[in-house]
Swiss-Prot record:
Molecular function via GO: ABC-type zinc transporter activity; ATP binding; ATP hydrolysis activity
Compositionally biased spans, kind Basic and acidic residues: 276-298
Listed EC numbers: 7.2.2.20
ABC transporter domain: residues covered: 17-232
Quaternary organization: The complex is composed of two ATP-binding proteins (ZnuC), two transmembrane proteins (ZnuB) and a solute-binding protein (ZnuA).
Name listed for the protein in its UniProt record: Zinc import ATP-binding protein ZnuC
InterPro entries registered for this protein in UniProt: AAA+_ATPase, ABC_transporter-like_ATP-bd, ABC_transporter-like_CS, Metal_Ion_Import_ABC, P-loop_NTPase
Described function: Part of the ABC transporter complex ZnuABC involved in zinc import. Responsible for energy coupling to the transport system.
Compartments (UniProt record): Cell inner membrane
Length: 298
């Protein structure tokens, strides 16, 4: 089912986080103002904008790290948040294994650690030192750390920093898959205007305020977006909408809405024409991206 049509007409919206006319005022100026956004369960919402546009400030309001100087921010009662910050103060030269990283902010049952690492594709790196991880592997470890506490919503601030291009594609696909598997909401903050569009349901473009919002196609065709990022930003985006017409089965096969299947391992495609098939690049997971030694790195 397409996540963007997962709410039948008249059904109650399960809003996890909502900002209404929210703004932060510091040192005689508004860092960001008039921000309206909401994230529902099972939805990926992406904040995009250039450096200094107010993306991280808006995210901190959403997390209740910053109190708005105007407007309001509300959370669903009992909301559990998994947060992956833009920067994390860990000295990666010190001995620190991936499984130890998972418990830095509190103990976790072994089965929860194992399940989270498996979900992000790095179960084989549980005992690896974080200093030896690639950028993509380290980001996956941080996502696993957030995921292990079973959040209702994950807030990811620039999650592909320090990751190469193929690793970025794999991470965005992972984020979409985690949403599909757990039905959590996702608030994604990024200045990356390319691959992120393929993994999101709704885009909110910031430049000190909300310039435009809507589906990826709506936003990239809006005059406000073009004025902010320039006409060159429209063509290279290669925006496509990832319709969720399939389910990932426990044995690894992909089941499409019409009942046909595809086997990612064998590389065979048995789905109808027009689906996102396993060989067309839309289902590249962690183990499909390798460095020259054959080890998965992103």
């Amino acid at each position: 089912m397409d996540k963007k049509s997962s709410h039948p007409a008249g059904a109650a919206r399960d809003i996890l986080i909502e900002l209404r006319n929210a703004g932060v005022y510091r040192d005689g100026r508004w860092l960001v103002r008039n921000v309206d956004l909401s994230v529902e369960r099972g939805e990926i919402v992406t904040l995009i904008g250039q450096n200094g546009a107010g993306k991280s400030t808006a995210a901190k309001m959403a997390l209740h790290i910053l109190k708005p100087d105007e407007g309001m921010v509300s959370h669903k009662p009992g909301l559990r948040i998994g947060y992956v910050p833009q920067k994390i103060n860990i000295d990666r030269t010190l001995p620190l294994s991936v499984e130890r990283l998972m418990t830095l902010t509190g103990p976790l049952p072994r089965k929860e650690i194992d399940a989270a690492l498996e979900a992000v594709g790095i179960a084989h790196l549980a005992k690896a030192e974080t200093a030896h991880l690639s950028g993509g592997e380290f980001q996956r470890a941080l996502m696993a750390r957030a995921l292990a506490r079973k959040p209702d919503i994950m807030v990811l601030d620039e999650p592909v920093q320090g990751v190469d291009f193929s690793g970025e594609a794999a991470l965005y696909e992972l984020i979409a898959r985690l949403r599909d598997d757990t039905s959590c909401g996702v608030l994604l903050i990024s200045h990356d205007l390319h691959l992120v569009m393929a993994a999101t349901d709704r885009v909110i473009c910031l430049n000190g305020h909300v310039c435009c919002s809507g589906t990826p196609r709506d936003v990239t065709s809006s005059p406000e977006y073009v004025r902010l990022f320039g006409s060159r930003a429209v063509g290279p985006l290669a925006v496509y909408e990832h319709h969720h017409d399939h389910t990932h089965l426990p044995d690894g096969r992909v089941l499409y809405a019409d009942g046909t299947t595809a086997d990612p391992i064998a590389g065979s495609t048995m789905g109808p024409r027009g689906h996102c098939h396993v060989e067309d690049g839309h289902h590249h997971d962690h183990e499909h991206h390798h460095h020259e030694g054959g080890q998965p790195r992103a």
